Amino acid sequence: MSAKKSRILVLDHVSPRGVEVMSAEPSFEIVVKPPMKETELVAEISGFDALVVRSQTKVGRAAIAAAPRLKVIGRAGVGVDNVDVDAATERGVIVMNTPGGNTISTAEHAFSLMLSMARCIPQAHASMRDGKWDRKSFTGVEIYNKTLGIIGLGRIGSEFARRAIAFGMRVLAHDPFTSLSRARSLQVEMVELDDLFARADVITVHMPLSERTKAMVGRDAFAKMKKGVRVINCARGGIVDEAALADALREGKVAAAALDVFEQEPPPADHPLRAFPQVVMTPHLGASTNEAQESVGIEIAEAIRDFLLSGEVHNAVNVPNVDARTLAVIRPWLRLAERLGRGVSQLAPDRVEDLAVSYSGAIGEVNTQPITRLVVKGFLERISGCDVNPVNAMVTAAALGIRIVENRVCALGSYSEILQVSAQRGKDSACMTATFFGSADNPRIVRINDRTVEAAPEGVLLLFANDDRPGIIGHIGTILGHHKINIASMTLSREKLGGPAVTALNLDSEPSAEVLKEVSTHPTIHWVKVVKL
């Protein structure tokens, strides 16, 4: 009797070359169908071991629950927004993606938009299609010898920089998390953001959308730019404030703009940018090339094949690559690791050069790579220009010029096991140390930099440095209470009576900028920071 075949459902017009890779394996049965609505997927998926999608089909909790045989979901592309990763993890389903497969296509598209914008190519083409021969209305500008400003020097930003240098442009970049040595290797000058705004003739954005980058290129930024600047957004809608861009175009501050991504997709018919002839717009085509789609199709097909045949995991976004016995030992540390990395990233200096992950006690005696990878993921996820997962975290860090170091260290005080994360650039650094109190469900941050604290690694952490004086805690409590922000726990760590101190508060909700400003008004409070874990 022949062995039961693994059944693979392939949707969303994944590259035929990718389908060929899987079809070549005689133990696989491949079913190829067009994109499905979730109700259709729920009805279809029950008999399959693997699912391969691009971005059209939404793989939600209901579909995953309806697939008792499902072992792996492959996303032919980078983002996994259309897959309920939490639901997949709960059901023991591995989710894989293809990081990096779209890099060249997106960089080339952004560069094409720059050239089209500079030479008025779309407008001249439209004029010709209307039967005109107008050589006067479409005078452009050269990009040779112009200054380019790149916001975000990750994979795509780096590829854009290489092409710009080949065209004779001077290249500036702002990226707090790319090292100076990495920038030098690309022949790029690293500058502060305001300096980039002031000096650049062309500005292109290649950052992820986050709270920090939302509306990063907005009214204040446009006010700092030189008259006649040109702006490109091929990254994420929302990084460029589109209403502010429309005003800057109307006022003549911005000469032209090119966008492939928008705050709302598709943008409404009355979107203000549609009214400007000097604006080039495309419908989110950054990754839409035959080569990119073929590349990600083959890459995900090979990953699915290897997993189903041997259990080998490539580019998983929701599981560490580790044997079952070790996983049982390290499981409590995995979530803690990601949160420590995330916390340190919010305290660290710009352009970190070294990220050290140190272990003490029994945890240091096992394979700690999965823990370290989650530290790096947590550190990078808010600031890198790509989707970071435990598999690509190390490669992403290397691309940013960040050196990752694992250490085994002596015990800290009476703690039998610790995990310590430290980020450093030159003499500037930030550090968090954590352990478990009694059981695996009771983690605690026990040190921040050189100060002993006791804080739960979850939610919102309010930190401030102060002089040890009476009334400070009352000052903070009054302000937070007035704004209906509850304090869950608090630690005050001082060097000596009346000396420097650091206070850490776990809060039930995030304080606004207004609240932080009120807190910082106390004359003996030197700085205030919010860390979201």
Protein language model regions, located:
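Short beta->alpha connector loops at strand-helix junctions that form conserved
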Residues: 33-34, 54, 76-77, 92-104, ...
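Rossmann-like adenosine-cofactor binding region
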Residues: 57-64, 176-272
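An N-terminal-biased, well-structured beta-alpha scaffold segment characteristic
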Residues: 1-96, 218
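Phosphate-binding beta-alpha-beta segment of Rossmann-like dinucleotide-binding domains, i.e.
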Residues: 91, 98-147, 155, 159-162, ...
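Rossmann-like dinucleotide-binding domain for NAD(H)/NADP(H)
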Residues: 91, 95-96, 219, 227-347
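NAD(P)-dependent dehydrogenase/reductase Rossmann-like domain
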Residues: 288-533
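Residues in the short beta-alpha loop(s) of Rossmann-like NAD(P)-binding domains
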Residues: 14, 177, 493
